[in-house]
Amino acid sequence: MHLTALLLSGCTVNLPAPVTSGDGFFDRPWPSDTRTIDGRPDLSDFPHLGEYSLLSGFIELGESLDGFGTNTPIYFRFDGTLPTGKLPSPEQSMQADAAVMLVNIDRDSPRRGELIPVEWAFQETTTNWQPENLLAVRPVWGYPLEGSTTYAAIVTTEVALLDEDFSAVWAADHPDHATYEPLQETLFQLKVPVDSVAIATTFTTQDTLGDMVAIAASIQQQLPIPILDQELEAGFTTGSFSAYFGEIVVPMWQHGEKPYATEGGGFVMDDAGNPILYGWDRTAFTVTIPVGTQPDDGWPTVIYSHGTGGDHTTFASGSTNVPATLLAQEGIAVIGISQPLHGDRGSGVNPALYSFNYINPEAGRTMFRQGALDQVFMAELMTRRGAVFTFEGQELRLDPERVAYLGHSHGGEVGAKAVPFFGDRIKGAVLSGTGGGLGITLIERNADDFDIQSLITDTLEFDSDEVLDTFHPAIMLVQMDAEATDPINYARYWHRQQPTWESAPMSVLLTEGLLDVNTPPHSTEVLAGASGSPMLAPTAQLATIQELTGLVEEPTPAISNVTGWDGSDVSVGLAQFPDDGHFAIFRNYEAVQLYQTFLSTALEDEAPEISSFTP
C-alpha cells in the first residue's frame, strides 16, 4: 500500500485499489476519451467479441458513433470489495463531497460544473459477462447527459485507494494531461482537491440529435412541400363524422430496401453533413370531418399518429371510443398516415418485428426517427397552407392556424422526438403510452408478444446468478447505440431547455396506465421528469427523478402551469391511471375527457387546459 494513500485516506487498510491496466474490457475505466479511435468508441476488447452474432451488429454500430452514451453506465474495476455503504444515494451524489460524482467538465458548456445525480451497482463476483469487483455508475433515469459534451466520472479516496499512475495525469508533462485538464479545472471550481480523486475517467458523448436537427431543417426550409388539395374517396360515415381517404407523398430519409431486415435503413449525409433524401413514399391518409357546419376558416385539426400494428385508419375505426369520434364531438377534424413499414407502407412483413429491429441495429436506430420526421413533415404540410379537399362537389377545408398532435404508443414515441421540431406550428401535443430510456424497456417490458429479456439472457448464455439490469454491459451497448432514437434525449427541448435550432416551448400532456405491460410506467415517469413536466394530482407512484425534483402532485385544472425557456407559459403534466393499462385514453372516460379538453382548448387559441380528473 502506498504511504501517500494511507495519509490521504486515513485508516484505509481495507480499501481496494482501482484496476487501470490489463487486457480485458473492464481493466480500464469505460467510457474514456483515451479509448477511442479517431474519436469513436473502441470496442475491440468488448467481452466475448465475435462469439455472439446478436451483438456483432451492435458492436459495429457502436464503433461508428462519434461519442459515448448519454444514459449508459460508467465502469470502474477494483482489486477488492468497495465499502458500498459509503457510496452515495442519488441525492448525495449531487454534492461535491460525494464518494462518486458525475460532472460536466466541458469548457464550451454553460452548465460546466453541474453535478449529475447517479445510481450505482457493484458486481462482487465474476460472471460470464462481468469481472468481480466491478462498479457501474450511470445517470439517474430522467437526467440524460447532453450530446456532444464532455463529462467526468470520479471515485474518491473515501472508498478506494489513490492510483498513483492515474494521479500523474495532473502533471502538465503527462501525455494524457490535455484529456484530464478540463477535469482538473472543474475540480478547482468545485473546491475538490485532485489528491482526493482515487480514479476518474473523462468522456465525450455522441451527437444524439444532430441527424434529426439537420433533416428537420431540410424539411422546413428546403424541401418542396406538396399541395395536399385533392378529390377524396368515400370512406364511411358515423353519427359523429365522415371518413375519407386520400393520397400523400412522404419524404423517405432511410436508405435501402424495405424492410431493412439485415442491412440498410440508415440515414445518409453528404460530405458537408447535409441529409440526402432517398425518395418519396406514396401512401394513403385518412381524414375525418365532424358532422355539422364547417367553420369559416376550416376545421381545427389533430394529426394522429398510431401505435405499432395499426395503420392510417386506426384512429377512426374499431369502437366508439376512437379519437375520430371523441374529437368530432369537439368539432375537430383528424388526419393520419401509416407509420413506416405499416399499412400500405409495408412490404408484407410483421411491422412490429422490423420496427424494433434488433437484428439490424442501423435500421433499428433510424426507424422511429423516420416516423418522427414523418410527423414533422405532416406538421409542415398542414400548417404551411392547410388543405382544401373536395368530395362530390363539397369543399372540406382544414384550418392551417389550428393544428395539434395526438400520438399513442408507437405514435407517442415518434411524437416525443418530433415535438422539439414542431415549433409554434402545433398548438399542443398529447402523448399516450409513451416512455423514454430504452434500457428500462428492455428490462421491464412484460408484454406477451415478445420476451426480450429471455432473448438476451438465453442468446448471451447468462450464468444462473447473473442479473440482467440496466447496468449490465449488454444493455449498455444497446442503449449507447440507441441514444439518437431514445425520446429521453429529446424531452428537455419540449419546453425546459432552449435548443440550438428555431423552436418554441410546447404544451404537452402525457398519460399512462400503471398496468401497462407494453410501455413500462417507469419509462413514462422518467420521460416526464426529463422534460421538466410535473406529475398531476393524484400521483400514484414516482420515479427517482420525481423524488429529486419534487415535481409531484400538481393541482388540476392546470393552465399555463410551467414557464418555458423563453418566458412563455405552457400547460404540461403527466396523468396516471392506476387501474388501466396501455390503452387508458381509449378505455377510461376520465382519460378521454382529459385529452378532449386539452386539445379542444389548445385549438381555440387559448392556453390548453389540463382539466381535473379522478383516475
Map each language-model feature to its residues.
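Short, solvent-exposed loop/turn and secondary-structure capping segments
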Residues: 87-91, 112-115, 147-150, 162-173, ...
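Short glycine-enriched nucleophile-adjacent loop
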Residues: 406-407, 412-423, 429, 527
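C-terminal subdomain of alpha/beta-hydrolase-fold enzymes, centered on the catalytic histidine
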Residues: 367-370, 424, 428-615
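Cap/lid segment of the alpha/beta-hydrolase catalytic domain
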Residues: 258-283, 294-394
